[in-house]
UniProtKB/Swiss-Prot annotation:
The keyword Lyase applies. PANTHER family: INDOLE-3-GLYCEROL-PHOSPHATE SYNTHASE, TRYPTOPHAN BIOSYNTHESIS PROTEIN. CDD domains: IGPS. InterPro entries: Aldolase_TIM (IPR013785), Indole-3-glycerol_P_synth (IPR045186), Indole-3-glycerol_P_synth_dom (IPR013798), Indole-3-GlycerolPSynthase_CS (IPR001468), RibuloseP-bd_barrel (IPR011060). It comes from Streptococcus pneumoniae (strain Hungary19A-6). Pfam families: IGPS. NCBIfam families: PRK00278.1-3 (NF001371), PRK00278.2-4 (NF001377). HAMAP family: IGPS_B (MF_00134_B). The lineage of its organism: Bacteria, Bacillati, Bacillota, Bacilli, Lactobacillales. This is Indole-3-glycerol phosphate synthase. Keywords: Amino-acid biosynthesis, Aromatic amino acid biosynthesis, Decarboxylase, Lyase, Tryptophan biosynthesis. The gene is trpC. One of its GO terms (biological process) is L-tryptophan biosynthetic process. It is an enzyme of class 4 (lyase).
Length: 255
């Protein structure tokens, strides 16, 4: 995702937010706290499993998937959380997917989108999300803090996504509990697991870390297991002929 492409996405989001109604806040869906679960289950590399029909880099991935059945298969086979793409224009997602999945699973759900405004946070919570994504590259640091604090007041957890050391330092200054490292280079569009391995040298003991993107095989997961609490996996699961086998392969016991 080039910076130019990220800018296009953010321009689209700004247009969407302008048209978006401010919803009344509904009760928070009850499930366990992701951070607490990750802290208490550090003997395993946990899998956050994603429901994603398409992406800008790959195009259509799996348009015919039964999203609820896919999410329930994830849950039944050890996923710690379901990530749901809700961006319509670039990822062929929908807020209804989040609403449907959240109503049919017991575990936390993550609203995976480009969040730039409080209205989106309320909307995510009302649709059943208990965790939202905030992307450091998409927000000025002051605005990132405003949205992080707002989500926290609403009882939501936040996955703060980073791509490089400067962004990781922003996440640390923010006091983020759960920090993601996206292995996709924003400038070249290339993905490299070494991004996660390199940034792990700068991790703090009191934070929880999730590696995102480009994780396909058990070998990939084993490479990340020494450094991370969890991995976020989408394409590998959406393309898998045997979803159960694939998700089991990615859950690494650390012993």
């Amino acid at each position: 995702m080039s910076q130019e492409f990220l800018a296009r996405i953010l321009e689209q989001k700004a247009r969407e937010v302008e048209q978006m109604k401010l919803e009344q806040i509904q009760p928070l869906r009850q499930t366990y706290r992701l951070a607490e679960f990750l802290k208490n289950h550090q003997d395993r590399l946990q899998v956050i499993a994603e429901v994603k029909k398409a992406s800008p880099s790959l195009g259509d991935i799996n348009l015919d998937v039964d999203i609820v059945q896919q999410a329930q298969t994830y849950e039944e086979n050890g996923a710690v959380m379901i990530s749901v793409l809700t961006d319509e224009v670039f990822f062929k997602g929908h807020l209804d997917y989040l609403r449907e999945i959240s109503s049919q699973v017991e575990i936390p759900t993550l609203n995976k989108d480009f969040i730039i405004d409080e209205k989106q946070i309320i909307r995510a919570r009302n649709a059943g999300a208990t965790v939202i994504l905030l992307i450091v590259a998409a927000l000025a640091e002051e605005r990132l803090k405003e949205l992080y604090d707002y989500a926290t007041v609403l009882g939501l957890e936040v996955l703060v996504e980073t791509h490089n050391l400067a962004e990781l330092e922003v996440a640390h200054r923010l006091g983020a509990q759960i920090i993601g490292v996206n292995n996709r280079n924003l400038t070249t569009f290339e993905v490299d697991l070494q991004t996660s391995v390199d940034l792990a040298k700068h991790f703090k003991d009191d934070c929880l870390y999730i590696s995102e993107s480009a994780i396909f095989t058990r070998q990939d997961a084993e490479r990340l297991a020494p450094y991370f609490n969890g991995i976020l996996v989408g394409t590998a699961l959406m393309q898998a002929e045997n979803v159960v086998q694939r998700i089991k392969e990615l859950q690494i016991d650390k012993g």
